[in-house]
A protein has these predicted regions:
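Helical substrate-recognition/capping region of FAD-dependent monooxygenase/halogenase enzymes
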Residues: 49-171
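Secondary-structure transition/capping motifs at alpha-helix termini
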Residues: 4-9, 43, 49-57
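FAD/FMN-dependent oxidoreductases across multiple families
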Residues: 1-35, 70, 74-78, 158
Length: 171
């Protein structure tokens, strides 16, 4: 549980949990720290907006649902790591003919381990995928990845993520 609202009850939460208080797992690839920081970031900006009167308190209802999805992914990833780490190596892996499973697992989970694989479903905050055509090359609800770009006006190289700074304004 990420809040104090009992299953089936319809009210705004008053108590929240984050990080290892609500998802404990074995430390294998460092993803737990990233997920914990994402929990608190997700809750923090919502609390600020509600307390400053910028958002309706019902916004706080989205925290538990969003983070529960990520916590489930964390536990699933942990189980995959356990299976890979406990499985015996194959002859092909020992001969070097096949990349070791642990390396493949690490590569397959780089975004999750690095804390950039966040994907939120349609909700109070995210538009339905019916609007996906408006965001070509980006998946609605997924974390935006910065990219190197060249500004046309002066040919200056820069990171796109540095241009769109987080300033707490809705756009």
């Amino acid at each position: 549980r990420f809040d104090d609202v009992p299953e089936g009850e319809d009210r705004n939460p008053r108590v929240f949990t984050a990080g290892d208080a609500c998802h404990t797992h074995s430390p294998k690839a460092g993803q737990g720290m990233n997920v914990s920081m994402q929990d608190t970031f997700n809750l923090g900006w919502k609390l600020v907006h509600v307390l400053q009167g910028r958002a309706n308190p019902s916004l706080l209802r989205s925290y538990s649902k969003e983070r529960l999805t990520e916590a489930k992914r964390l536990v699933e990833t942990d189980h995959k790591w356990s299976r890979v780490m406990s499985a015996p190596t194959t002859q092909a892996e020992r001969d070097g003919a096949e990349e070791p499973r642990i390396i493949r697992q690490f590569k397959d989970n780089l975004e999750f381990t690095g804390g950039t694989a966040v994907k939120y479903d349609t909700s109070y905050l995210f538009a339905a995928s019916a609007h996906q055509a408006l965001a070509k090359g980006e998946e609605i609800g997924r974390r935006f990845h910065s990219a190197p770009v060249v500004r046309v006006s002066d040919a200056k190289q820069m990171q796109l993520g540095h241009v769109a700074e987080a300033d707490a304004r809705w756009r």
